[in-house]
Regions:
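A short beta-strand-to-alpha-helix junction
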Residues: 317-324, 448-460, 504-510, 521-537, ...
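Active-site-proximal alpha/beta segments of enzymes that process anionic O-linked groups
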Residues: 170-437, 554-557
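Transmembrane and membrane-interface helices of multi-pass
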Residues: 1-205
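A long, amphipathic alpha-helix that forms part
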Residues: 390-398, 432-481
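Short, solvent-exposed loop/turn segments at secondary-structure junctions
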Residues: 15, 262-267, 296, 310-312, ...
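Histidine-centered active-site microenvironments of extracellular/periplasmic hydrolases
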Residues: 473-520
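Membrane-interface soluble catalytic domains
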Residues: 5-9, 66-67, 139, 143-148, ...
């Protein structure tokens, strides 16, 4: 026994109690045998790591481990704090806290969106103080036991402790190796365990397992290679477009364009009970029941709406700060481009590569920010800003100069977390009406109350849609106005263990309603549409002289091509090149990765997010190949050599 033995044991017990309880909650009270082993082993592995590091440093300085007790204490305090943060992140995203999530959570405005208050920070400070006190007490107790009780313990007991500790180390490594194998072979249920245990560390040993388990044939490896530089080819195409823009014309230059874009509006709210106006318009105008955003978060989704580009081209556009081709065209044609928003345009640097200099006027209704202590919480009246925005737009639309065509982009906030609406629109009851946090331990049990709150905000948003479309109709401008109604991305309410968005490619997060009024055109034959198809359809309708395929990688909904009846979605990224994508057709969804010059297939599911099952006569390998072939072709859209 050393001076720190009891110190490590006490903190192992403390971490075990917290991690096992948290894992039980995240698993909805149902833990498999292997998950219990993982949950119990996690705190042991953390303690072993801290002890090994502290002992290694002490040996480096030729000193006793006890001399570095404050280093061990600091590491333990950090471990407790990180484990607590990781538990909250798991409750929201079902993934462990990492660099990507750090970028998402600390993007400008996100903490305000989450409703973080000064009292929440004060509570966090109290918890950290409590952790420090506990670690200090455990250190004090360990030192006291060593000073006063060590002589009362037999040498045999001390040896038994050492033997037991070594056995636990071996068992810990066996568990880690087993999970590494299960993780590599993509055992879905076992991977679900990983997403329910805070601070669980995976030993990533793909290079060890790959030679024994998965040996791809040469033809498969060759097919996966990307032999062209699609990003450079895209940039060259943009340069060519800039040279040709001066000679570009359009058949229709007097048609107005109105975008009604709603934060976090998921596809299944387009029903008469929740959004009667939108449901009615979907039967009268072009619509799609399988419409996908470019991504599951705002920046990437908005990129698709205004650029007409599929997700492969977000990163090069973002890095080069390219103005959307469609906005350049409209600007060239003399359009007055106005943006009305209740969201800051600087979010995800959208003011640099989406809402660029082509925009003539920006009407911001974002005066609700009052710092962390501001009551921008669940019972706030942020919906009033959407009302003010609509009134301003209608005033401008009715008084605009008829000879100057306009594009108006209205961006609504009411349907964003925390979901805002007047009390008179509280149709769906009961709904949550207290201050709540998205990472609360008990919120999963109240997900139906949160969802009702969301449906009320969608019901209110539908009222605004009716107000705008009715006003345009009454003004006599309907047959001269393109109207597009959609969400920037979807929103999850614990259907797959998560809340909100940004971290899953399931339909609830990546699919949105889509309704578009193109005067004289009632329908499209496409079964699957995406944000990237909107601008190509508008430019096709206007009769732009440059062919669509030279301008966009999305498709025009006016020109049916069976080979293009699909949508591509990317993972949420704020500043980095995305690696994970999804392609969806009318029946299937395939996740795939694009990295290091290779495109490789991942999980295949039905279009309804159901796992595939063995059905006689269904060739899943062929389905995967066909979907991957379509994705690869779109990847080479601007590459002449491909």
């Amino acid at each position: 026994m050393t001076r720190l033995t009891i110190f490590y044991i006490l903190n192992w017990l403390g971490l075990t109690i917290y991690i096992v309880n948290t894992s039980l909650y995240l698993s909805h009270g149902e833990m498999g045998v292997f998950q219990i082993i993982m949950a119990v082993n996690t705190p042991l592995f953390l303690i072993i790591t801290i002890k090994a590091f502290t002992k290694g440093i002490s040996k480096l300085f030729k000193s006793d481990e006890h001399e570095f007790r404050y280093l061990a204490s600091s590491l333990l305090v950090f471990t407790y704090i990180f484990t607590g943060i990781d538990a909250k992140v798991l409750a929201i995203y079902r993934d462990h806290f990492n660099i990507k999530l750090f970028g998402i959570l600390f993007e400008t405005g996100v903490m305000q969106d989450l409703g973080v208050r000064s009292s929440d920070l004060f509570s966090l400070g109290i918890q950290i103080f409590g952790i420090c006190i506990w670690v200090w007490i455990s250190l004090f107790v360990s030192n006291w036991v060593f000073e006063n009780k060590r002589n009362k313990g037999s040498e045999l007991t001390s040896q038994n402790i050492q033997i037991a500790f070594k056995i636990l180390i071996y068992l810990s490594m066996v568990e880690k190796l087993l999970f590494s194998y299960f993780h590599y072979t993509d055992r879905e249920r076992i991977n679900g365990y990983w997403a329910s245990i805070p601070s669980y560390t995976v030993l990533k040993m793909s290079k060890v397992w790959k030679p024994f388990i998965h040996t791809s044939p040469d033809s498969e490896r060759e097919a996966a290679k990307i032999t062209w530089n699609f990003e450079n080819d895209f940039l060259l195409a943009q340069s060519q477009f800039k040279r040709n823009i001066s000679n570009m014309t359009a058949e229709k230059t007097n048609v107005n364009i109105v975008f009604l874009v709603f934060e976090s509006l998921r596809s299944d709210v387009k029903i008469p009970e929740i959004m009667p106006n939108l449901s009615r318009l979907s039967r009268e105008w072009i619509s799609s029941d399988r419409h996908f955003s470019n991504s599951n978060c705002t920046g990437n989704g908005t990129f698709g709406i205004l650029t007409g580009m599929t997700p492969f081209y977000w990163y090069p556009s973002y890095k080069a700060e390219y103005q959307p081709t469609a906005l350049t065209i409209l600007d060239h044609l003399g359009y007055n481009i106005d943006v009305y928003t209740t969201t800051k345009l600087g979010y995800s640097d959208m003011n640099k590569h989406i809402f660029t200099d082509a925009v003539d006027n920006v009407y911001e209704f974002t005066g609700y920010g009052g710092g962390l202590g501001h009551p921008m919480v669940k019972r706030s009246d942020l919906y009033k800003w959407d009302e003010m925005m609509v009134d301003k737009f209608l005033t401008n639309f009715k008084s605009r100069e008829p000879s100057t065509p306009s594009m108006s982009y209205l961006w609504f906030y009411s349907t964003h977390y925390n979901y805002y609406f007047p009390e008179s629109f509280g149709k769906f009851k009961p709904y949550i009406d207290r201050h709540y946090q998205i990472y609360e331990p008990e919120l999963q049990k109240e997900s139906h109350l949160v969802f009702n709150r969301y449906k009320n905000s969608a019901f209110y948003a539908d009222h605004l849609i009716g107000k705008i479309t009715d006003a345009i109709k009454e003004s006599g401008q309907s047959e001269n106005t393109i109207i597009v109604i959609l969400g920037d991305h979807g929103e999850e309410f614990n259907e797959f263990g998560r809340f909100a968005h940004s971290y899953s490619l399931k339909n609830v997060q990546s699919s949105t309603p889509f309704v578009m009024h193109l005067p004289g055109i009632l329908q499209s034959n496409y079964k699957v549409t995406s944000h990237a198809d909107i601008m190509p359809s508008i430019m096709d309708f206007m009769g732009v002289s440059i062919p669509n395929n030279q301008l966009f990688s999305g498709k025009s909904l006016l020109q049916y091509n069976e080979d293009l009846d699909f949508a591509i979605v990317q993972e949420c990224e704020i500043k980095n090149r995305p690696k994970k994508f999804l392609i969806a057709d009318s029946d299937w969804k395939l996740e795939f990765t694009l990295s290091k010059g290779k495109i490789e297939a991942g999980n295949l599911e039905t279009i309804l997010d159901k796992p595939i099952s063995s059905i006689e006569g269904v060739d899943y390998t062929q389905i995967t190949k066909e979907l991957l072939k379509k994705a690869k072709k779109n990847l080479g859209h601007f590459s002449n050599s491909h």
